[in-house]
Amino acid sequence: MTQKLESVGSERKSSEYMWDDGSEHDDVTKIYVRGGTKGIEFIKFGYVKAGELLDGSFHGYSDTGFTQMFEIDHRKNEHLLSVEGYFDYYNDIMYAIQFKTNLKISEIMGYEYSGHKFTLAMEGKKIIGFHGFADVNLRALGAYVTWITPARMEAKGGKGGNEWDDGGDYEAVTKIHGRSDHKGIKDIIFDYVDKDGHPKSETHGPTSGQGYVLEPFEINHLDKEYLMSIDGYYDDASGVIQALQFKTNMKTSELMGYYDDDAVKFTIGCTVNKIIGFHGHAGKNLYSLGAYFTTLPLTKLEYEDSFREKLPKNGASGNLWDDGSFQGVKKVHIYYDGYSVRCVRFDYDDDGKVESREHGPKIVAAVQEGGFVLDYPNEVITSVEGIATVVNTGLSFSTGNVMIKSLTFKTSKGRTSPTFGNVFGNYLSEFKLESQGCAIVGFHGRSSYNSIHGLGAYFFPMPPSHDGKALEEQGGDGGLGGV
């Protein structure tokens, strides 16, 4: 069912300038935003309906400024999930806007000024249309949302038994256990948690108690652990599944059961989705297994949250920048001196193309340049550690402006970059950006004409490696990559 989210922004709406793209679309495909110092001038959306691309109208007025475009690939099952923006109610201007899909996040479009931050989103739903108010500027924006249908992968294995289906309306799989006998998996039990946090258990196969108990596999969804893939083996003659092995973004289960040398192997999984439900066939044994998938979440860690103390001005030193998210980080460039980190540049992987984003001034007297190269895609950044200080104060950490003094990067291969910057001084505070089982896929922060003032990151769960083990830190230090 489609639901209308009321527009956010100007309270002085005129019916003459109201617009509505409607909700009769399957997905949003392209977004054009023209921004300037006077705020968002116009916005335009492209949609898709039954495979046909639809070009929307311009909403607003084109003046001096710059146009940014954000593309959403509906062919890869990518959906628009949310919109964030900044609106100044005093001046009646929308200054900045940012879009998030199930696969990536756009860079911030426009400029962040002091104003009200708003969000258009609804849990478990995607945006399929927009409405709002625009005259010489975009003044208000609302949206239409509808439920996201989980993707269903057909059952794999042999033929036999009766069909069963747990559905795909759960939040997560939390535990897998069962029994096995000389033929293979006898019964299997899946523990789920629904979207309201309530547990539920489903058993498939006989419940006679015969066979030996398999080692249970628990998944801590509260710690952002997600079931991502399954390897299975079945006997082609009997059709019985002989063994199963489950993989999350953090660990791999023991092999449940056994398999013959001539067993047929199958895999269920997708690197950008998590498994939230199962279906298949079972009788005296488990014969086949299929799954329901939904998208993995991107995690945004704010630089404010990574400090041990509350930041001066709530961390608002300098101007906001946001690169959004990409497939991964290939190289970092750091420009620093004895006082602070002056400039950062990140080389990202954007579907095989290198996209670079630079923030802060690198032309400063006595600045040093350092770089750290990743063996991407086999190696990813898993954490950033840094030291910040406060300048223009003789009192305490609670006043003044924050400046980043040093940065250190760690990777999934256990390498640690050199420390870029100076770790000594007064009013120092350490911070760390890390999300267990996840890789950094983008950065955001604050900078000014002379320094980097804050650094945050976007994290995405890491897929299991080919040997069945999740990419994780393994110890040991690495050296300086090429500059």
Swiss-Prot record:
UniProt KW keywords: Lectin, Repeat
Ranges where the Jacalin-type lectin domain occurs: 2-147, 150-295, 307-461
Pfam families xrefs: Jacalin
Disordered as annotated region, ranges: 1-20
Organism domain of life: Eukaryota
Example of a GO MF term: carbohydrate binding
Family affiliation: Belongs to the jacalin lectin family.
Record-given protein name: Jacalin-related lectin 13
Source organism of this protein record: Arabidopsis thaliana (Mouse-ear cress)
Encoding gene, per UniProt annotation: JAL13
